[in-house]
């Protein structure tokens, strides 16, 4: 099978070098590998799709050798909040989720959590069924689907953003079960914790192993801390679609930054958050407290133009996706771009940023075997150059 690589013109000079044949056994040499929180001149052996060894290694008989040409060798990225990519949207069913899986791998993503949006219960169930199908029968050469992230319907109307207001409802496990109907793929849920019944839902979902997050919410800081007491562990797209930070009422962002139990998701596209805000949040929470996300819609990886999100027209201009009203409607961000932006725009050290796109999001949803270059981990390696441009993927 030909392992095609995705390029956006940033590093066409590497294209020929990394148009590789998929091999069962491969040794990656001459790269600066991100291992145990630091960059090392280390070789990486991949066998049967998994990292087998890391260190100063000699080739085995018949083993394919790939020269990383001095590039940074990173763990494959983990995106825990992504609606769509390359014209495919997880709300449209199994075929689109499979297209997302194969396409995202070419951008360096090793694993992702397809994220639903507000819809009627049957539509939500249909979308979850498509995600479940790919969880149960993964793509042979695609990014792993870790489960579903339900970003609706238990949201506050005031902060709905691009969500469909008519599909929002009060939190209850009865409503949740009506949408899920026994499916086992749900891994995350975003809700507004100040709504009546939300704390009970958070506690119940924790018992089922579902990670809960706060966003599209009018919560005050006290509501977030109470939700964390009940089991909430993340803030979705920090500062966006939530109460603002104020010095006398810190709101959702202030509580999320202050509470060490909470991981904050950030969209590092320079549109949703100013670089100074990215820097402040990154320095406040550190590598283990930030999960970089794309929150991308179907225009990610495609040119500017008109697209769709939940039946709404979305206009993408200069990479910014907005409804006709001007409201932001997801992003067109790719994970490797988020890494570059955190380093080059926000000025956060690479050693701090890499975990934010790899091990921290993986750990935050209990995804073992992703986010690190270590024996047993997924054998997906993202390559970036000294200017933090994406150079290719080895998988």
Tell where the protein language model's regions lie, with residue ranges.
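Metal-associated gating/positioning segment near the N- to mid-region
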Residues: 71-126
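Acidic, glycine-enriched loop/beta-strand segments at the rims
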Residues: 33-43, 288-289, 346-354, 363-395
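Conserved, mostly hydrophobic/aromatic
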Residues: 150, 205, 235, 342, ...
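Conserved phosphate-binding/catalytic loop of the ribokinase/pfkB sugar-kinase fold
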Residues: 156-183
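Active-site core of metal-dependent hydrolases
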Residues: 177, 181-302
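Short acidic/histidine-rich active-site segments
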Residues: 288-310, 315-332, 375-376
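Histidine-rich, glycine-flanked metal-binding segment
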Residues: 7, 20-74
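Short, positively charged and aromatic/hydrophobic N-terminal segments
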Residues: 4-7, 13-17
């Amino acid at each position: 099978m030909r392992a095609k690589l995705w390029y956006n013109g940033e590093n066409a000079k590497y294209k020929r070098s990394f148009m590789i044949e998929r091999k069962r056994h491969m040794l990656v040499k001459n790269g600066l590998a991100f291992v145990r929180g630091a960059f090392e001149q280390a070789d990486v052996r991949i066998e049967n799709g998994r990292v087998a060894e890391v260190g100063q290694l000699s080739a085995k008989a018949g083993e394919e050798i790939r020269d990383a040409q001095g590039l940074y060798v990173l763990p494959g990225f983990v995106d825990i909040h992504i609606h769509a990519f390359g014209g495919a949207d997880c709300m449209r069913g199994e075929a689109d989720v499979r297209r997302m899986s194969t396409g995202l791998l070419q951008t360096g993503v090793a694993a992702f959590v397809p994220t639903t949006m507000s819809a009627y219960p049957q539509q939500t169930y249909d979308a979850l069924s498509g995600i479940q199908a790919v969880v149960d029968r993964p793509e042979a050469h695609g990014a792993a689907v870790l489960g579903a992230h339900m970003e609706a319907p238990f949201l506050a109307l005031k902060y709905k953003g691009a969500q469909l207001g008519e599909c929002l409802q009060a939190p209850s496990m009865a409503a949740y079960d009506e949408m899920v109907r026994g499916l086992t793929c749900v891994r995350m849920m975003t809700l507004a914790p100040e709504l009546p019944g939300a704390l009970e839902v958070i506690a119940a979902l924790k018992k089922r192993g579902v990670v809960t997050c706060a966003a599209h919410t009018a919560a005050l800081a006290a509501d977030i801390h109470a939700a964390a007491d009940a089991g909430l562990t993340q803030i979705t797209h920090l500062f966006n679609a939530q109460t603002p930070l104020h010095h006398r009422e810190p709101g959702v962002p202030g509580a999320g930054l202050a509470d060490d139990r909470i991981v904050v998701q950030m969209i590092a596209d320079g549109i949703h958050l100013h670089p100074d805000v990215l820097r402040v949040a990154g320095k406040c929470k550190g590598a283990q407290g930030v999960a970089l996300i794309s929150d991308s819609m179907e225009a990610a990886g495609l040119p500017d133009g008109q697209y769709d999100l939940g039946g709404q027209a979305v206009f993408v201009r200069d990479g910014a996706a907005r409804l006709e009203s001007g409201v932001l409607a997801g992003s067109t961000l790719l994970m490797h771009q988020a890494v570059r932006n955190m380093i080059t725009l926000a000025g956060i050290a690479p050693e701090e940023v890499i975990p934010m796109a790899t091990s921290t999001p993986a750990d935050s949803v209990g995804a073992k075997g992703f986010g690190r270059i270590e024996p047993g981990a997924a054998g997906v390696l993202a390559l970036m150059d000294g200017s933090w441009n994406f150079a290719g993927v080895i998988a």
